[in-house]
Swiss-Prot record:
Gene3D superfamilies: Herpesvirus/Caudovirus protease domain. It comes from Varicella-zoster virus (strain Dumas). Region of interaction between pPR and pAP is called Amino conserved domain (ACD). The region of interaction with major capsid protein is called carboxyl conserved domain (CCD). InterPro entries: Herpes_virus_sf, Peptidase_S21. This is Capsid scaffolding protein. Its EC number is 3.4.21.97. Residues 326-344 are annotated as: Interaction with pAP.
Amino acid sequence: MAAEADEENCEALYVAGYLALYSKDEGELNITPEIVRSALPPTSKIPINIDHRKDCVVGEVIAIIEDIRGPFFLGIVRCPQLHAVLFEAAHSNFFGNRDSVLSPLERALYLVTNYLPSVSLSSKRLSPNEIPDGNFFTHVALCVVGRRVGTVVNYDCTPESSIEPFRVLSMESKARLLSLVKDYAGLNKVWKVSEDKLAKVLLSTAVNNMLLRDRWDVVAKRRREAGIMGHVYLQASTGYGLARITNVNGVESKLPNAGVINATFHPGGPIYDLALGVGESNEDCEKTVPHLKVTQLCRNDSDMASVAGNASNISPQPPSGVPTGGEFVLIPTAYYSQLLTGQTKNPQVSIGAPNNGQYIVGPYGSPHPPAFPPNTGGYGCPPGHFGGPYGFPGYPPPNRLEMQMSAFMNALAAERGIDLQTPCVNFPDKTDVRRPGKRDFKSMDQRELDSFYSGESQMDGEFPSNIYFPGEPTYITHRRRRVSPSYWQRRHRVSNGQHEELAGVVAKLQQEVTELKSQNGTQMPLSHHTNIPEGTRDPRISILLKQLQSVSGLCSSQNTTSTPHTDTVGQDVNAVEASSKAPLIQGSTADDADMFANQMMVGRC
């Protein structure tokens, strides 16, 4: 255990925060404005202990006031043993590269703020319809996470700086607290606790909260509920040590690159150093970091040039654990931005002046010349246009309005907690650019689909045979198309209909021949049959007769040379054959029906 702490060198730490928020808690934790008004002012001093241990008192409450959001307190913590135990338990790399520039008071503020960031109010349990008195508030305990909402506190070295980060606290409440501090008589009081007991209490606090899920996320949420912004020492992050944490405008972020110096510059506001993850005012940064010179934003071109000249002389110390073998150079972001801002103004070069700058040779086959003059504003970028004195001046630098708008948007996003790197999702889905060139089968009727699949759209005469689709090669239109089932069904219906029609004509012809024969009663020579008028005959019969006459000659010649055959058909068939072989009378004309029947009978051979 460390030696006995020096009580004279132990400075006081001031702690401030809300003890509760109205209408935020439920059950016995809820505190109403009527209860607070009845309990104020307290009749006795209210102690400040650790984790509700009454034998581990490290400070005292200076004042409690009623704010519109809830009871707000300001207290003092001065315990040399607490500083000694925390200093001995902290790792040597806990403060990173700021270990040599931080004072003992600042180290104590970092350790206490991050180890005990919240408070828990212990009050008297009230019975139903009981009105509280001045003994309602029992004590205030420093802890990791309190049960009530918005109970994260802020530690600092002065009363004014401890209540300053509470932006929602009214100015009247702040003035009343500061007036009560002047009347407080215990500013030089010291509270002593055994180091062994204090070490056990601190260890018990860590053990009892180690299973709390996402405790730093809960602390960050409670801090935002309390309205704390611009705080200095609270690091609500899961990273180990202060070198892995950044804190910009009260918004935490988890960054894996520990130990890299990276500062964010805000005009007239604090500077947040990524190497330490804390925010300090411009004056404090100049005092604590001698190798960094804090400058305000440039207001004109002469200021930009002066800032660029000063930034070129900056030689920051590399942090511990970072290789410095010439692989890279560590430059704070704020001064790198100022350096780029000072170099955006293009120099006025007279025509014909010699160019002694560096020339860069482009790759083989590049459309640009092998060498073009350097441009500090657009180095590493392709040439923008050809209208400058050299021909390739690069992209024009942004004007002052664009810079101001960019700074305004960044500040607005940081205030509202908006991540500008997150891609936007509030946009419509991308439309298919190839959709107009695709085939639209839904708008086609069945005939179009059949003609398209079969490739025989010329049969109906309404659609072209070679359908062309935009964007499709010519040879694709002539490829074999897939034939739909409806096409074959239609072809089958057409062929069956033709056969049925022919069979009907033949049946009608046979019926007509039978009727003519029945009128005469007996078989007569063909010359005695009367001719049937042309108007009463089916025109399709004449067409079929002409087609059969061309075939009858061949069939008759074959019958004359062939041997006679024995026909076992009935008497009607023999009669028809006899009539067909009867000689024609000279000068008579044969009837078309008889000729057709004769040819049909001859065709049977």
